[in-house]
A protein has these predicted regions:
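The feature marks non-catalytic terminal segments
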Residues: 19, 28-41, 152-153, 182, ...
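Short Gly/Thr/Asp-enriched flexible loops that form oxyanion-binding sites at enzyme active sites
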Residues: 269-285
């Protein structure tokens, strides 16, 4: 029994000391089936470039890991549209065979490899014939799945918290530590809905930010083109108001949030698209609960009466959220620090004048309880007060 106990203890210690797998992409050898002139672009860590292959059987790359090592997994990041892809290894007869594949639902995906894999292919999933537009390919060596390997869950069937925002990076600039606290620390289903899809590289930066903040549910984007204005009226000249209302009402019904957050009615620094978000939410809270409004989404999802809605910088029923409390899920970092890390994932925005700030005129810790079906906040330090 003593020997068995010692063996068990050693086994547990070995696993307790397991380290996250390292990115070994730069050390691997690659043999692309097509598109060799652009293949380097899927390893340059630049989200504005991509590797384009031919269609069909030549849509693959063979990967050989460094001698004496093995690969544990692969992450792909796609340009503009998700792609159904998979990993292949050779069987006993030397034939390439499927070792796992995706359905092509997400712009960033991770697949594990069979233990001890030293040579494999990244190729189309069975039945997929399209060419690759692959922005980044990342190969991971031996070890546990690394924290940056994005393994998205479907968009929430029932959201605890929903953010309706205009652009990529708004989720941390104006909402601070909300996602790190509620998604990362408390494990709540947090659904982010965005009006402007923006450029493909910004969507990948956005996913990096959400993943850094602990969000697991895949976001959704509408298709409104980006256009700057300083007024609500000018914004609605570019975007059809009824289409915006229809979209936001459908999101509310589809995701059924307990708590909904959105932009300042004045658009923070005045951005018309931010104003649209606030205006649409204020209108659609009632519409989403009315079966006679936008009958298509009412039939598909039913109606939904949102229990609580907070608007950034709303002057009534003010809550001042403390984003400076340490979070165990992030090793003691505060939600503010994690939000800052998330914003740094928006690499293309680092030379702008925007910063994550829980102070000043656009303080991202200040919100007003615009609507409640569960009574007023008393403690005023938790969006889920009276709901938990």
């Amino acid at each position: 029994m003593a020997a068995a106990g010692l063996i068990a203890a050693l086994f547990l210690c070995a696993f307790a000391g397991a380290e996250p797998a390292e990115d070994i992409t730069a050390q691997c050898k690659f043999n692309a089936g097509s598109g060799r002139k652009t293949f380097a672009k899927c390893r340059d860590r630049n989200y504005e470039t991509y590797w384009k292959t031919s269609n069909g059987e030549k849509c693959y790359v063979e990967v050989t890991v460094p001698e004496g090592q093995s690969a544990s997994g692969v992450m792909t990041q796609w340009f503009e549209h998700p792609h159904a892809w998979g990993v292949q290894v050779k069987d006993a007869d030397g034939k390439w065979t499927d070792a796992g594949h995706t359905e092509g639902e997400y712009l960033a995906e991770y697949l594990p490899l069979p233990e001890g894999t030293t040579v494999f292919r990244v190729a189309n999933a069975p039945g997929e014939k399209r060419h690759f537009n692959l922005t980044e390919l990342r190969i991971y060596g031996e070890g546990d799945t690394p924290p940056e390997a994005q393994q998205w869950e479907p968009s929430a069937s029932k959201a605890d918290l929903m953010l309706i925002v205009a652009h990529q990076d708004d989720e941390v600039l104006w909402f601070g530590g909300a996602l790190p606290r509620y998604a990362g620390q408390e494990g709540k289903a947090c659904q982010v809905c965005m009006l402007v899809p923006s450029m493909p590289y910004r969507r990948l930066e956005f996913l990096d930010c959400l993943w850094t903040c602990g969000v697991k549910n895949y976001p959704v984007w509408a298709k409104f083109p980006d256009a700057f204005s300083y007024s609500l009226a000018k914004a609605y000249k570019r975007w059809n108001k009824n289409t915006v209302y229809k979209t936001v009402t459908e999101w509310i019904r589809r995701f059924q949030p307990d708590v909904l957050l959105t932009h300042d009615l004045q658009g923070e620094y005045g951005h018309g698209a931010h104003r649209v978000c606030a205006d649409a939410v204020m209108h659609c809270l009632a519409a989403a609960a009315d079966v006679k409004k936008y009958a298509g989404s009412a039939k598909q999802y039913g109606t939904w009466d949102v229990p609580k809605c907070y608007i950034h910088l709303w002057k009534e029923n003010v809550v001042d959220m403390d984003w400076r409390q340490p979070l165990d899920a992030f090793g003691g970092k505060t939600s503010f620090e994690v939000a800052e890390e998330g914003f740094r994932r928006h690499v293309s925005q680092q030379k702008t004048d925007y910063h994550v700030e829980d102070w000043g005129p656009w303080d991202n810790s200040l919100f007003g309880l615009y609507r409640t079906l569960v009574g007023p906040d008393e403690e005023k330090n938790d969006f889920f007060e009276n709901l938990n």
